[in-house]
Amino acid sequence: MATFAPHISKITKSSTKFNYGRIAKTFLGVAGSAAIATYFYNNGNPFNNNNNNNNNNGGSKNAAKALFGASAGANVKIAKVPEGKSASDYQKVYNDIATKISENLEFDENAGYYGQLLRLAWHTSGTYDKSDNSGGSYGGTMIFAPEEFDPENAGLQVGREFLMEFLVKYPWISRGDLWTLGGVAAVQESGGPKIEWRPGRVDDNTASKVPPNGRLPDASKDGKYVKDLFARMGFNERETVALLGAHVLGRCHKHNSGYDGPWGPSFNQFTNVFYTTLLGDWHVKKWDGKKQYEDDETGEFMMLPTDMALKEESYFLKYVKMYADDQDLFFKDFAKAFSKLISNGIKYPADSKPILFKTLDEQDEE
């Protein structure tokens, strides 16, 4: 396969900027990863959150039809912020999540919880279908079948359990808000861009709005599949490539997805390394798992078939090269696309303003 970028050993040149800050400082002081508390969900009302009611929001169906088409009338999603809650309340939740992340940096072979939390936010949002405004992050439905048992969600109970204590501590926050906020914290605390986030998701505790399985990305597919799947959510090719840059964080596990390994050396730092690594030389890995690719130079990194599709299709490749050359541009595009992903289908009040959370490092410097 042709090489379009420097070899992996050279990816730390000026196109990639690492921001270690609190991550490195905290890691040096970590003696071991803390135990993960185990919680159990039920199919009724896990927490009687003030924000977890199932209001019909009378009169909103016509607005939804105007926004999303006639078929969206049954899938009205009006943001409703718990009474008396403001940006400062959500910043406290962010701080608690970020602190817990920083206390568990050795988790998963030093990958930490960044990839887990980003994947949870991504997958709870990635079921959205713009044709009828169904799915997405609004209802926090991943605790219900069949979504909970979607093969593409295997392993995400770890991320949900990581965040569970904050549903207890902050009973007014919805699952949808907490899970997406966790993804924002993962990106920002690992050195990534600021993500605009808005509260107001309302939990579905009746399991009446659970999306069908099959909407999340199947990593074994080709470029056309990737293009069509992201188009279903309302994304163009550029946004698609930007969103898949999330693979820079974390790693795959054979016992969950059938794939194994990190995508590159930056698995606990949000950078553009996914793209520079992807543009190297690869071969199909010889092993007993699903088809995946292994880098020629080190044999330590992996790519999924859907990742490789980004360099095989010209309508994706130009953006891969663009982001490999310009991390600042990638950050800008990712921030915009990810904010769109986690908010898809939700109608916010006209006076609703996005929240930009301060990182722990920024607060330390104040």
UniProtKB/Swiss-Prot annotation:
Q: Which reaction does it catalyse?
A: 2 Fe(II)-[cytochrome c] + H2O2 + 2 H(+) = 2 Fe(III)-[cytochrome c] + 2 H2O
Question: Which prosthetic group or cofactor does it need?
Answer: heme b
Might you give the EC number(s) for this enzyme?
A: 1.11.1.5
| GO cellular component terms, A-Z | mitochondrial intermembrane space; mitochondrial matrix
* Subcellular location as annotated: Mitochondrion matrix; Mitochondrion intermembrane space
Q: Site annotation (Transition state stabilizer): which residues?
A: R119
Compositionally biased tracts (Basic and acidic residues): 195-206
InterPro entries of this UniProt entry? Ccp1-like (IPR044831), Haem_peroxidase (IPR002016), Haem_peroxidase_sf (IPR010255), Peroxidase_I (IPR002207)
**Keywords, comma-separated and alphabetical:** Heme, Iron, Metal-binding, Mitochondrion, Oxidoreductase, Peroxidase, Transit peptide
Would you identify the family this protein belongs to, as annotated? Belongs to the peroxidase family. Cytochrome c peroxidase subfamily.
State the name under which the record lists this protein: Cytochrome c peroxidase, mitochondrial
